[in-house]
From Swiss-Prot:
This is Ankyrin repeat protein B19. Residues 541-574 form the F-box domain. InterPro entries: Ank_repeat_dom-contain_49, Ankyrin_rpt, Ankyrin_rpt-contain_sf, F-box_dom, PRANC_domain. It comes from Vaccinia virus (strain Western Reserve) (VACV). Keywords: ANK repeat, Repeat. Belongs to the poxvirinae B18 protein family. It comes from the Viruses. Pfam families: Ank, Ank_3, PRANC. Disulfide bonds: none annotated. ANK repeats lie at residues 56-87, 135-164, 167-213, 217-249, 253-285, 327-356.
């Protein structure tokens, strides 16, 4: 901030011309005062600095503490010239309160000076909220200001109760919020080093602070810290765990600290692992209900490495599997409902049933459609799971809901329709029959014109005719793309590769590529596993030697790609 005088006090006046109150108010409230200036020297020697403004009750000291050009040097001069540090404003504000909650770049020395000038010291009830308000101001107002370790230490040493509550919060609640928001994206806050944060928390504990104090919502400071959307604050979290916060306290919503983290807007995989490990090491085995909630709630939340996290959770909590239900839904149902494609992929690879219904008879596709909050991703998620759906009734139900599906990406919508036409033989004919119906045509007006929709369907239909005319050994390309059995598709692998490069298929080339890659990787991993287990198959002491290699291949093809991959590359234990 540039040093610019807003107001210049006239000191060359006759002795009969006294300094007016409004002049002092303007001077101390708005001027960028130089502590060596003749104006300041003139004022402190010729004006009663403890004279109060009639309405606000401000003295010269109060005015200066609210000055945006505040400096410690000027404040020291005022303190040395007898300002009364115990006088309150009309609103009840003490000077030391204004200093700690309003001023920037405060010197520890001036805080000590001001406190020492008060004969009541800080044990008086007027000062009971001073420490809390000091830290709160750095959290809410002065976000770029540092929390001075020496000031915190002084306030605690002078007898301020660290467990004093205001609106349910203690000073530690606000300090933990400061620590969390330092790492929150978009926040412009001064960094807090881990060593300094640890020293300040240690100061609180040494002076009797309750690390597990509850606010009005039942949250401990650690609850609040974990509930804030954070980014890469692994080391800070690790430091806070050294104070061994209580992991079993539930807030008013029934959430423990770990569940607060799981239900926040952002999950860091390494922090999740760290929290669970700390719980099991220091508390013991986690209750089954909490384990179940952790896994199900995790799926609903954005995370940095969802595939790694769900794998870790499923391996860690052995009694949670693909059949486990919570509120009538399986893990796969929840993953579909919240468009978590990474988790969907993992659960299907470990044999999760995409066609299973919820307790109230809803299919996964219906859960995706019903979740309006995720409407921008509805088509893409439906498109993602269509490759796993074989129930024609489900496909037909999807087709019937096409007019109401939100369209945010026309290319994804075209691909979705191409899948529906491929998997539902009756789709095109039913569309043609209803083409002239005004009710049918009007249903599509919300997201796109009917003519555009009709054009997409016609284009897809023409290409399906071309698929039916394209022969692949003893069948057609149309039948191959509709087949989900990778063992049957294996014999068409070479032909699929050839058609995959055929430029005449513009719409179905992506589906061809998916089919080809699925079969290719399945065949590759079957061969890898067979080669790896070959010494076992050929061991004369093993009964498997009695089986022909064709039968062994049949057995291996019954496994999922995930199973085959784990046999080929055994996962390390977490």
């Amino acid at each position: 901030m540039s040093r610019r005088l807003i107001y210049v006090l006239n000191i060359n006046r006759e002795s009969t011309h006294k300094i007016q109150e409004n002049e002092i108010y303007t001077y101390f409230s708005h001027c960028n005062i130089d502590h060596t200036s003749t104006e300041l020297d003139f004022v402190v020697k010729n004006y009663d600095l403890n004279r109060r403004q009639p309405v606000t009750g401000y003295t010269a000291l109060h005015c200066y503490l609210y000055n945006n050009y505040f400096t410690n040097d000027v404040l020291k001069i005022l303190l040395n010239h007898g300002v009364d540090v115990t006088m309150k404003t009309s609103s009840g504000r003490m000077p030391v309160y204004i200093l700690l909650t309003r001023c920037c770049n405060i010197s520890h020395d001036v805080v000590i000076d001001m406190i020492d000038k008060d004969k009541n010291h800080l044990l008086h009830r007027d000062y009971s909220n001073l420490l809390l308000e000091y830290i709160k101001s750095r959290y809410m107002l002065l976000k770029e200001e540092d929390i001075d370790e020496n000031i915190v230490s002084t306030l605690l040493d002078k007898g301020i109760d660290p467990n004093f509550k205001q609106d349910g919060y203690t000073a530690l609640h606000y300090y933990y919020l400061c620590l969390a928001h330092v790492y929150k994206p978009g926040e412009c806050r001064k960094p807090i080093t881990i060593k300094k944060a640890k020293r300040i928390i240690s100061l609180f504990i040494q002076h009797g602070a309750n690390l597990n104090a509850l606010d009005n919502c039942g949250n401990t400071p650690f609850h609040l810290y974990l509930s804030i959307e954070m980014c890469n604050n692994i080391h800070m979290t690790k430091m806070l765990l050294t104070f061994n916060p209580n992991f079993e306290i539930c807030n008013n919503h029934g959430l423990t600290p770990i569940l607060c983290y799981i239900t926040s807007d952002y999950i860091q995989h390494d922090i999740l692992v760290m929290l669970i490990h700390h719980y099991e090491t220091n508390v013991g085995e986690m209750p089954i209900d909490e384990r179940r909630i952790i896994v199900f709630e995790f799926i609903k939340t954005y995370s940095t490495r969802p595939a790694d996290s769900i794998t870790y959770l499923m391996n860690r909590f052995k009694n949670i599997d693909i059949y486990t239900r919570y509120e009538g839904k399986t893990l796969l149902h929840v993953a579909c409902e919240y468009n978590n494609t990474h988790v969907i992929d993992y659960l299907i690879r470990i044999n999760g049933d995409i066609n299973a219904l919820t307790d109230n008879n809803k299919h996964a596709t219906q859960l995706i459609i019903d979740n309006k909050e995720n409407s921008p991703y509805t088509i893409n998620c439906l498109l993602y799971i269509l490759r796993y759906i074989v129930d024609k009734n489900v496909i037909r139900s999807l087709v019937d809901q096409l007019p109401s599906l939100p369209i945010f990406d026309i290319k994804s919508f075209e691909k979705f329709i191409s899948y529906c036409i491929l998997l539902d033989d009756t789709f095109y004919n039913r569309h043609v029959r209803n083409r002239d119906s005004k009710t049918y045509r009007y249903a599509f007006s919300k997201y796109m014109s009917f003519d555009k929709y009709d054009g997409i369907i016609t284009k897809c239909h023409k290409e399906t005719i071309l698929l039916k005319l394209s022969t692949v050994l003893d069948t057609t390309l149309y039948a191959v793309l509709r087949c989900h059995n990778s063992k049957k598709l294996r014999r068409y692998l070479t032909e699929l590769k050839k058609y995959n490069n055929d430029k005449s298929f513009k719409i179905y080339s992506n589906i061809m590529n998916e089919r080809y890659l699925n079969v290719y990787y399945k065949d590759m991993y079957v061969s890898k596993v067979y080669d790896k287990l070959f010494p076992v198959f050929t061991d004369k002491n093993c009964l498997l030697t009695l089986l022909p290699s064709e039968i062994i291949y049949e057995i291996l093809y019954m496994l999922t790609i995930n199973d085959l991959y784990n046999i080929s590359y055994p996962p390390t234990k977490v």
